[in-house]
């Protein structure tokens, strides 16, 4: 392990420094300058306590202050054996540390810098845990993602900014990876080693506990300084895509090839794809076989394509599916499927500039070419689309105002995206649900939202009707508009709709397919392991300071996420009427259960004490008659009757 100390100065003010600075100027600049020390491990850098403001050093040696402010001063390095020699990886990490510190504001500190696995070497990625001390009562923390083109690079870029709010959760994803969910955003990280992962999770756990205790919620003044870094995002699109990656996607964008680095296989696949269009257009698709298509490609390209048979078949299926073009619902709006979202030629031909992705399992295929807005939901009745329809309406209107067009898609263009287009038509044109459904199904017969989305559309219709008939909501100051999204946990599901009369058989079949796009959801997901529960489990392994105390069942940590039902006997007591939890956090629920258990125990002791007291009086009479003694029994009666005795004394 090596120790690195970085002297940090305030940013340059743009004014020249006097040739002969006075003592007052030196002292002032010395107060602004401070030092931060780091412990350099293999794959991670841990921030140590601040080394102080450096006033004495500034006054004793004014010459270092002649260097331009805003630059990092040379670091003081030490190795484990006290000598100056360092291994190559330590030198690389030292250089990277200096570059990453230069990205920060003077008042912000790096608590941890962890190296992450990169999808495309020789790129390097670092996760920074950054906190600030700018006069805040509570410490605030954000996560930054930093990209290096390679290990020898002398520059780095910023690719991720994730503030840690009170709802931050860390889940272990297996194989050394973990995901951080905060403020509705979820990001995946995978450190390069077990030691790096352990150091990272410890720092993250501490930061999450501080955020939870501080009550940091979006929308207020908390973490306002994070916007400084959000405006500085400057990594290339490939790096941004890697930071935005999700673990449960089913459809992925094709890998981005580095300029001038396409492999021979990629070049051949591009040539096959270019010729495949022409071969399919010139063939009778009702009679031609896959083998004949491959032979025609071999004649055109002049080389055998045996090893590309699976690629050719896959591309043929893709091109066949893309022949089902997106449906033009309005002059500025197309409704389509995953295939339409992946067809770059069709998107450009339709003058699409905005893409509204309503699917949880489908990636953004061309994030560098189009403006995307994502609503990550599954096609299931319990999914909530209503809270997102105000944002989706605004997104579609932005495209129309620019004179371009928007594609709204999900997996098949049947349920999720169709419901969103229906909601847009109802609000934009003042239509009822029935009129909007007739219009959309005429242009795309396979449209059939699942029953849960239809119920939400009915609710949305009532909201729009109330908004049009009364302007009281808009005139009152501070009253939320009736079109504001409803929170999913308080929305009351309407009774199921009766089956619609009529309808084409094709629409019914495709509607069933649309509602079964994700059958794996019905089987239930494996419970995710929460970092907070793991840390509490680890804390229970430490020896207790009170040997006589025992751990009750209610004090055991909840290792798995709150999506699963806890397996303890008093779980039903932590829910309010209607089956909803009173509090999402584990500690209030534990305290509530312990209080209820204590009340039940006191009532049980009191009832048994009265019973024993009655029995003791009866037995005492018998003993006086028979002349026998039962000392142990009398002691037990007196001990258990003490509860009632204390109550009688209180009444007296």
Curated annotation (Swiss-Prot):
Q: Which residues carry this modification: Phosphoserine?
A: 9, 37, 85, 87
- Top-level taxon of origin: Eukaryota
**Reaction catalyzed:** O-phospho-L-tyrosyl-[protein] + H2O = L-tyrosyl-[protein] + phosphate; O-phospho-L-seryl-[protein] + H2O = L-seryl-[protein] + phosphate; O-phospho-L-threonyl-[protein] + H2O = L-threonyl-[protein] + phosphate
Pfam family of the protein (one)? DSPc
Question: Which residues does the entry assign to the active site, renumbered to this chain?
Answer: 410 (phosphocysteine intermediate)
Q: Would you tell me the protein name for this molecule?
A: Protein phosphatase Slingshot homolog 3
What else does UniProt say about it? Tyrosine phosphatase activity has not been demonstrated for this protein to date.
Q: Where in the sequence is N-acetylalanine found?
A: 2
- Keywords per UniProt: Acetylation, Cytoplasm, Cytoskeleton, Hydrolase, Nucleus, Phosphoprotein, Protein phosphatase
Mind listing the GO biological process terms from this record? actin cytoskeleton organization; negative regulation of actin filament polymerization
Biased amino acid composition, Polar residues: 1-16, 80-90
- What's the stated role of this polypeptide? Protein phosphatase which may play a role in the regulation of actin filament dynamics. Can dephosphorylate and activate the actin binding/depolymerizing factor cofilin, which subsequently binds to actin filaments and stimulates their disassembly.
Quaternary structure? Does not bind to, or colocalize with, filamentous actin.
Look up the EC number in the record and give it.
Answer: 3.1.3.16, 3.1.3.48
Carries keyword 4Fe-4S? no
